[in-house]
Amino acid sequence: MNRAAIAAGKPSGSISTGKPRRKTRAEVSEEMKHEIREAFDLFDADRSGRIDFHELKVAMRALGFDVKKEEIQRIMNEYDRDQLGEITFQDFEEVMIEKISNRDPTEEILKAFRLFDDDATGRISLKNLRRVAKELSENISDEELLAMIQEFDRDGDGEIDEEDFIAILRSTSAFS
């Protein structure tokens, strides 16, 4: 256990997020572990097996976590046991698995919604879907896009609102 963990009365490696701690999932998918490794390796420029404050911030951002300087500093203080200003891959993996396990699924869904709703109307329209399809280099006809909207448009207004979008994604195993 490190000093910060002992002082806080918690096991080494747990991160204070200000939220009640959820039960950590015993497993993170192998694909996710691979992504964690890739993010670490990408920013471990000197291949030392360690990353510093700035590399940690960018690696976490690459994994979808836009964290403030204060949180990065807390992580560094907790995991930089030898006071070199760096953390190891094992520490990074532990931090990321905990953060991934503690993600708020609704917040993740709303982030995805905002990627579609680029005009900030609170609704996903045919225009929004057309733009996303184009960005993804998908050649999808307006008829197919409209069929997608109609399939999930619960109030029948021709657009998908946040409530519709949340219901769609909650029905998948990724967010259940």
UniProtKB/Swiss-Prot annotation:
Superkingdom: Eukaryota
CDD domains membership: EFh
Disulfide bonds, paired cysteine numbers: none
Localization per record: Cytoplasm, Cytoskeleton, Microtubule organizing center, Centrosome
Ligand binding (Ca(2+) 2): 153, 155, 157, 159, 164
Name of a matching Pfam family: EF-hand_7
SMART domains: EFh (SM00054)
GO biological process: cell division
Keywords annotated in UniProt: Calcium, Cell cycle, Cell division, Cytoplasm, Cytoskeleton, Metal-binding, Mitosis, Repeat
A molecular function GO annotation: calcium ion binding
Main localisation: cytoplasm
Cellular component aspect of the GO annotation: centrosome; cytoplasm; myosin II complex
Domain EF-hand: 31-66, 67-102, 104-139, 140-175
UniProt family annotation: Belongs to the centrin family.
Something else known: Binds two moles of calcium per mole of protein.
Subunit comment: Monomer.
Name under which the protein is recorded: Caltractin
Species: Giardia intestinalis
Gene: CAL
